[in-house]
Amino acid sequence: MRGSVIGAERSGQTIMVALVLMVGSFYTGSLFGTNQPIYVSHPSSHSASSKFANKIELTYRRLPLVIPESGMNVCPLEFNEYIPCHNVTYVHQLLPSLNLSRREDLERHCPPLEHRLFCLVPPPNDYKIPIRWPTSRDYVWRSNVNHTHLAQVKGGQNWVHEQGQFWWFPGGGTHFKHGAAEYIQRLGNMMTNETGDLRSAGVVQVLDVGCGVASFAAYLLPLGIQTISFAPKDGHENQIQFALERGIGAMISAVATKQLPYPAASFEMVHCSRCRVDWHTNDGILLKEVHRLLRPNGFFVYSSPPAYRKDKEYPMIWDKLVNLTSAMCWKLISRKVQTAIWIKEEKEVCLKQKAELKLISLCDVEDVLKPSWKVPLKDCVQISGQTEERPSSLAERLSAYPATLRKIGISEDEYTSDTVFWREQVNHYWRLMNVNETEVRNVMDMNAFIGGFAAAMNSYPVWVMNIVPATMNDTLSGIFERGLNGAFHDWCEAFSTYPRTYDLVHSDHVFSHYNKSYGDGCLLEDIMLEMDRIVRPQGFVIIRDEEYIISRIRGLAPKFLWEVETHELENKDKKITESVLFCRKRFWAII
């Protein structure tokens, strides 16, 4: 077991761990402040340090659930990158039962309750508070993502380079090693017949498949284009961890056997640059998932060898892609350099004709209405049925009432009231957190409802992952219609992200929703543990909920090594105030 021990006693197999507050702000007026932890390396050395009683012990989830008086146990240091539902060791045990030809091994596989870890995930050795945005777009601390594989195999394509104590991201990629900005301009020209850019082509929201370190998304931001970037946890180890450390919206995911956790008709563009997806296989079922996600007149951008190479099996793959896209009534609008671009023309008559010719099957209406959470991929094509034009800019989308909300009974007055409420609350949040706005970049709203919190945060230099629990009504379609991004998720399970991802996690009545309703894996302590895993050291957790839940969390927070304050803020009815918890994760380490 690595780590020094404070105190001389050892009891049985329990080893006491030194947990030290890393005091002082990383930024003291300059980019690279002190950011140095205070280590205790000898039992008699207690100066300027804080000792905790938490024990280092590999602990699994058990019933009844009991948190020791000494506080939550701390997982051993080797679990510093633990992702419960993407655990390579557990997935390896499942391999005989998985469809490897369709890469089911890359999807989420959450362990049963008794195999879940129930201990705090520690930071790695020499972890530092992340560099602030926008500098983090180009530089992150090497010790925070201490993996060299990508730099070794992708350095020549300008993904990432090592520079002393930093990782440097030049903005390149496999198909844009000379820079994402030039590549993005080229795509805009291809979409507009050399007359405009992605904005004039109507692109506001993008899904980047197999995103690498997310440089493509980073360079779309100046255009006001919002991107969800995803990639699996595969041989390109830690690519999503790099993206999130940079402050770019990303998550772990894979196109394999299940629908992606996003609503239908959510994106104007789906992008694949050497994304390692075999779109041409299995009767194009993966392309049909792209069709589901694209809005009418949305674009599929494909930068990959079959689009330009004439050797090996690439011409055969290209012919299959052409046949599959034609059957879905897509139109190939440009093919040059190393990229092909299709447009999804929403021609209902065409789709019905293709169905009559047995070239495709059309999805049932109820398939369109289901939340996309653990839903098997459908070998059918959805007709979106959309008739209303979306505003052309992000600013307009943020304020316009989404028509999809009317379908689920949310009126325009309720929408306006929610927007005003969260604008006021976000102002209070910043005042009470009392930090520079650049200290918060990655934000998650665990129960986003219709996106009012994220819309209010839009004036700050942050991005927000809006989560709509899969057990609630599908309001995520309305969130996407507002120009915001998000995903479906079930908080009985861990989220598909690395530890230490978010600077701020916002929870509005998440605990009361899951309280005693969804099984033992969704207890208050389970959700708190997942919050702790995904929030960064010195990051914030803001919790609004029923008073009895607030009281319980207030009592448990110190055992999770959270500082906690209670503030009274106006509730949604604006008739009374409610207690809101402001928790801050301490910066501690195993020594």
UniProtKB/Swiss-Prot annotation:
| EC numbers for this chain | 2.1.1.-
**Some GO term, biological process aspect, for this entry: which one?**
methylation
Q: What is its main location?
A: endoplasmic reticulum
What sections of the protein cross the membrane? 14-34
InterPro entries in UniProt: Put_SAM_MeTrfase (IPR004159), SAM-dependent_MTases_sf (IPR029063)
| Glycosylated residue positions | 87, 99, 146, 193, 323, 436, 473, 515
Spell out the GO cellular component terms annotated for this protein, sorted alphabetically and separated by semicolons. Answer: endoplasmic reticulum membrane
Say which enzyme class the record assigns. transferase
Q: Which residues lie on this side of the membrane: Cytoplasmic?
A: 1-13
Pfam family name, one: Methyltransf_29
Q: How does it sit in the membrane?
A: Single-pass type II membrane protein
What molecular function does GO assign, one term? methyltransferase activity
Alphabetic keyword roster:
Endoplasmic reticulum, Glycoprotein, Membrane, Methyltransferase, Signal-anchor, Transferase, Transmembrane, Transmembrane helix
The keyword Glycoprotein belongs to this UniProt entry's keyword annotation: yes
Lumenal topological domain ranges are 35-591
* Compartment(s) of residence: Endoplasmic reticulum membrane
Q: Which family does the UniProt entry place this protein in?
A: Belongs to the methyltransferase superfamily.
| Listed name of the protein | Probable methyltransferase PMT6
Q: Which organism is it from?
A: Arabidopsis thaliana (Mouse-ear cress)
